[in-house]
Each structure stands twice: as structure tokens, then as C-alpha cells.
Amino acid sequence: MTWFIDRRLNGKNKSMVNRQRFLRRYKAQIKQSISEAINKRSVTDVDSGESVSIPTEDISEPMFHQGRGGLRHRVHPGNDHFVQNDRIERPQGGGGGSGSGQGQASQDGEGQDEFVFQISKDEYLDLLFEDLALPNLKQNQQRQLTEYKTHRAGYTANGVPANISVVRSLQNSLARRTAMTAGKRRELHALEENLAIISNSEPAQLLEEERLRKEIAELRAKIERVPFIDTFDLRYKNYEKRPDPSSQAVMFCLMDVSGSMDQSTKDMAKRFYILLYLFLSRTYKNVEVVYIRHHTQAKEVDEHEFFYSQETGGTIVSSALKLMDEVVKERYNPAQWNIYAAQASDGDNWADDSPLCHEILAKKILPVVRYYSYIEITRRAHQTLWREYEHLQSTFDNFAMQHIRDQDDIYPVFRELFHKQNATAKD
């Protein structure tokens, strides 16, 4: 009997290669579908999988077919509407073709719905954050902060003699020799029993005894030819270098929770910060996040309180900037950390406080951070805070600001702020 052993690395997902090829081929259509779908999700459901739909015409495969020209004769059984040389037009109407449900009703016409398939959570997040990076990440400092330590990582079939594992190699040798000689040993045992019976019987069966002795000798020779150790048995201790946990960057999240921020505006701010958190945790291993909520007073909070606390009040934006400056001086030396900040507000601020925000950012924060992003979530006209920040944008290259009017703007603005083209290292 012949046995086939499937040694493919993705044996349990035999269509994985085809799936990955499909995702690469139609990446543009899939990313467009994802960017439309993310705005329809709830705040707590941003990181799950997604059903993606692609128009059928976008996934049509190239094919060989006869050209429209030339002379051809065909027989269509049961035809009573057309005669020779008539050209059959494609039916028009809402009955087929788009699958979008926007056409008019029709009694004829046919087509295909959009192609819909499910992508996993990992595929969804990979496509969601593709081509994004922390801007101005200081690569030379990142290498200084990253330390690698050697750790045992199982066994490997290749290696240097100094790393050979004698015990594991002998175990493999015993298993191989047992598997290769088990059948022969059973047959040898049966022949030896038959030989003992014949040798003790009367009259002696010399020819049969000679035949059995010959077969026994051949089986023993075959068993002895199985090598005690083979290169297939050898196993070496495997070692790999793993980065020693060390923080390389810190992100400050500053969210306005004043009374002027209605629930809809707060939800949009939370969506932005959830995207930011998923992006950081998905792309970078060692990034700390500092959460700061502010109204008239600022407070450093944990992740749960940042997203779910109901505390509110007036508006003094400078309180959050002062607290961030204090935390940086206390815990994050700019010479050793890549410092980032993302601020979200509706732009409503006490008028005399906006110039103070400009001063704190210009003199204390922007000189030490790698990148500072500000998003203003409002449908109203911009106020003094936006105008003060516009002066900063024209002066500092590491300051960016964007305007969000409604929920559909969140993901495009997020990609604009953290697009990989901006991720150039500073010397």
C-alpha cells in the first residue's frame, strides 16, 4: 500500500495561497470597500472581520473568445423572434447587471449580484492600516533602544556540530529504525518459530529447514543494513534572537470632553482614537500610550476611563497641554523617546486661552515631539484655537491639523495624518 504524507506548511488551509493571490489582485477594490464599511460600524466593533463586496465586472477574468467580426452560422432551437443576421442586444433595465437594487423593476433581463466574501480580522486590520506609519520615527534611536537576547527556540534539522542534540537525534534514530524494521522483525520471528518446529520434527525436513535458514539470514542482513544513525535523524538545538522588551515611542492622546462636545462629536473622537490605538498595537510592539481627558481641568486616565467616563465641564485646552508637558519632563526624556501626540477637540475654547495654547506648543511641546496632530470635529466655523494652530502649522513641520465634519471623514483624515510618505526619519 502506498502512503502519501502532506508536509505542506499550510496543510489545514490548502486554499490559502489562492486566497492571498486574490487579495493581492483586487486590493484596490477591497480597500475601497473597507473604507466604506468602517464608517458603518459601531465604536466597539472596529476591529472584527468584514464582509467585502466587489462589483462583478471588476473580477472578470481575461479569456479567449471569437471576435465580433467575421461570418458565423449558429442554430438556436426554439427561436421564433429573430431571423438570420439579426443582432441580439443585451437586455436593459433593473432586472440584472448591477445587483445594487437601485434599478427599476423589469420582467426580463438578467445579471449577477456583486461578489461578496468574508475577510478575517487579521486581513481586515492589515488592509486598514497598510501604508501607514508613525511620522518622523527616529530610526537610529530605535536601534539603540532595542536590545536582542538569545533564546532557545526548539530544534532544527540544520546546524553546526557544536549545537547537536544527542538525545533528540538518538530518539529520532530509534523511531526511524523501529518503523523501517518492525515488519521484517515480525516476519523473522515467525520464520524462527517455524524453523524450531521443523528442526524438532521427525523425520527431518532438510530442504524446508535449509530454505527457512536462508530466508532468516536474508532478513537479518536487511535489518542490519538499516543504518544506526542517519542525517535525517540529526537534530540541532535552535537559538534565535528576540528583541528585549523596551519602549521606543510614546503617544499622548488628548481628548476634549467639555460641555460643548455633544455625544455625536465625542463618538467621532473616540472612533479616531480607537483607530489610532489599533494602528499602534498592530504595527508597533513597544509603544506606550498616555491618555489625557480635559475640560477646565486635565487628568491622566487609564484606557477604560478615557473612552467611557461621563465627566464633563467647561473648556480650557491649555490644561491638557500643561499636563502633557509635565508628564514628558517627568517620565519621557526626549533624547531617549520618540514622543507623539494626537489632540481632538471641537475647537471651542476660552478666547484668552488659545494664545496660551499657541505659546505652550511653540515653546515647550513641539520642540521635543516627533509629530503632533490636531483634529477639529465641528460643522461650525473655525474659532480662535484653529486660527492659532494655523500659525503653528506654517512654522513647524512636525505639526499637522485636519478638519472632521462628519463620520465619513474620520478614516480618510486618519490616513492623511499617518500616511507612510510622512514617515521620514530625522537625523
UniProtKB/Swiss-Prot annotation:
InterPro entries: UPF0229. Residues 79-90 have a biased composition (Basic and acidic residues). It comes from the Bacteria. Residues 92-102 have a biased composition (Gly residues). Residues 79-110 are annotated as: Disordered. Belongs to the UPF0229 family. PANTHER family: UPF0229 PROTEIN YEAH. This is UPF0229 protein YeaH. It comes from Escherichia coli O1:K1 / APEC. The gene is yeaH.
